[in-house]
Amino acid sequence: MKEMQKIKAIVKQIIFYLKIILSFFYTFLLYLKIVKPKIIVRMNGGISSQMHQYLLGRIFTEKGYIVAYDLTFYKYWAKDNNGHFERNFDILKAFPYLEFKQSNGIESMAYILRFADKTDYFDHEEEDVFLYNIKPPKFLGGYYHSPKEIWKDLFPKYFHVDPQILDNDSHSLYMEIEKNIHSVGIHIRRGDLAVHNNAYGRPADLDYFNKAILYICSKIENPFFYFFSDEPQWIEDELIEKLPIVDAQYKIVNKNGSDKGYMDLFLLANCSHLITSKGSFGKYGALLRDSKDKIVVLCDDPLEYGWKDRLQNPVYL
């Protein structure tokens, strides 16, 4: 058994070094202009992160550049920051009509070794204006504060809700929400954002959700709340009894696991109003069906203020 493990380890190491050699050869072909240069965008995270990264690539296809997406995250890690929840590559399940080119392993390695952007993570909330000046070959592997046209122009151009991709259970709930003009979606992100996170700050707390529900109740007659979360059991066991609602006023949506999170995104989008938490899932749900009549409640946190110009009717509490 130990001998077999050693052999496997040696073979894996040989394959790794072969990939490095081939990646250098690929880079040589690039310099000789035998292969065309492109921009490769790394994809990772859940469905909303994938949507963001897809739009980042579209900035450059709109300029006429070749763009491909690196999916190695989903091959070797595919977890949240805590390593607890699965992160699946779902964007083509949610939006099967998208034009999509995947980079191969040799290509990605060549770009990472030679053409990786060195400023791919930022602590500030300003737009990453340097994106306007990028030309291929380049590897983009971070989370960028993208230019405003991503949200104003590209988001509605590329992303549309199609209930036909839903399974039977989710489609039935989608139609129920569609008929309920007083529907309010509440997204509660737990998992790796249940505690303080450097990128997102402190998590949305009980006081925030109480204020948000009371605010909605002051604006809407007979609201009905649909709860969406990566930990629905926690909502039922720990949260519901502490909120200012009664049994007839809510439903905890527990139909879709991490393999169908994109279906929850469509269900959330179909709600008339939204209460969001930290992270981008709830905001992307709002953007998919945004309107001036749609109340979207957000945490009153400077880290969330970047959404002011992206949503039509944001409310900070």
Question: What do the predicted segments below correspond to?
Answer:
Residues 2-34:
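Short hydrophobic helices that act as membrane-entry/anchoring signals
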Residues 12, 16, 305-317:
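Leloir-type glycosyltransferase catalytic cores
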Residues 34-40, 78-220:
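Secretory-pathway luminal glycosyltransferase catalytic domains
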Residues 43-52:
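A short, glycine/small-residue-rich beta-strand->loop->alpha-helix junction that serves as a flexible
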Residues 47, 219-299, 303-306:
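Donor-binding and catalytic core of enzymes assembling or modifying cell-surface/extracellular glycoconjugates
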Residues 52-60:
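Short amphipathic alpha-helix
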Residues 67-76:
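A short beta-strand-loop structural module common to alpha/beta enzyme folds
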Residues 80-95, 235-246, 310:
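Short, aromatic/basic amphipathic alpha-helical patches
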